């Protein structure tokens, strides 16, 4: 396997011809191995917080912090502690003995407290994406914002060591900040992908010669190799656009699947897979840490302490790999942001900040107007709205179903999470192989993922068939049945995450990557409210979580015709044509300004 020292230095190809400059000061240096691994490093850093924090231990920590401060709704006895009833803290208390906590004059269920916190976090995250992410397309903001979100987010996870039950509300504040930084950083990270692909030597050769001369991304034993990266030289962060290599304008790819899309898909898939690898590793370490600390006297007297140690570990991991990203990933500056110059005085700085936020909201509106002129972008975003809603709804419903109807323990739910995560890791590596083996276009691969995803709700609905219900098995009637479905969920999610992100990247007008990925993320987060709300209403109406599978089955099918209609090559050419014909020229850089 290649060593870190080998990865950190990759000689530049002597015959590499840089692409044409879209604006003054653009860095068109060839993409090297170190820069690609710097991009991977942040995914490895933040995916751990997404899976181990947001997806597993943060909800448990919030609920337990509130529970230790709460009381039973009817008897007003403590939920935990020596005076608590034996069944109060283990999930077997009757409904009228729910654990509640006083907050702002109300008595809130401790589980609902965690749900409300994450709902607020998603809302704040969406506002932050709009306010700041569009600025990443300008000057050196792209890398600066990525690192700022990474270090602030990791700090919120580590600060949970200081949160004790009497100040459980501060834990909610940390969650809101952490989730906001997580989502915002991924938007900025995604905006690097089209730029890295555009400056890759193999893509430039394929464009210049009108060939599909791509990297051979493969695995030989344990060695990961990309053929054209073996001889590159990474010239460092200070490599500028000027140089001895002639700047040339790429020609249009002649194939139905562009070199950019193929390489983008492969890099994206590997990035998702490496993120899942890191998440599984830290999740296993976290479970071992929880098991060890829970046996100590301190862990028994302070139930949240083991969970807070896990969040400390997650935060340290996030910060450490963000440092690696800061060393290896180039800034890739955008064009100057005209009219926004930081002032010297305090008041002037506030005025500049307000102008920046106002500009970001205006930029979002401009992004929407530009997107509406690109048919493939509109169709894809409509499909992505439904796909992301389905993923979020299936995840939430599955956990709720496992706890309430299959009665899985917390450890079993954790193992279910690891199963899905490991499957997602395998899926991220598997889908590119499947796509190459059967010569599938990106949208066809997404359609195959959606078809497999439909297995989950269909299997859950089998229990509505009388003779299957009488068997007492199949249709999610036994706890073990949810684990194979967890594998399906993971494999499909890994494919959808990488292929949807990569396909959308090819539809974006060059120079507007961060703004369009902010719209991509806003579509994702905006849809996350819809499905869970409808499933919740169905549960209230029927008293059964299983009824949610009916809605999920329909929801998963809805985006299929839209995905089928997306033509990636036509969308890419439309985006390039829009940039070339944009007024005020400089190739329309900065959202076609």
Curated annotation (Swiss-Prot):
Subcellular location: Vacuole membrane
Segments traversing the membrane: 42-62, 112-132, 159-179, 181-201, 271-291, 305-325, 377-397, 415-435, 448-468, 480-500, 525-545, 548-568
Chief location bin: membrane
Disulfide-bond pairs as recorded: none
Record's GO cellular component terms: vacuolar membrane
Gene3D superfamilies: MFS general substrate transporter like domains (1.20.1250.20)
Membrane topology of the entry: Multi-pass membrane protein
Residues the record marks as carrying a glycan: 90, 443
Role summary: Vacuolar effluxer which mediate the efflux of amino acids resulting from autophagic degradation. The release of autophagic amino acids allows the maintenance of protein synthesis and viability during nitrogen starvation.
Name of the protein in question: Autophagy-related protein 22-2
Origin species: Emericella nidulans (strain FGSC A4 / ATCC 38163 / CBS 112.46 / NRRL 194 / M139) (Aspergillus nidulans)
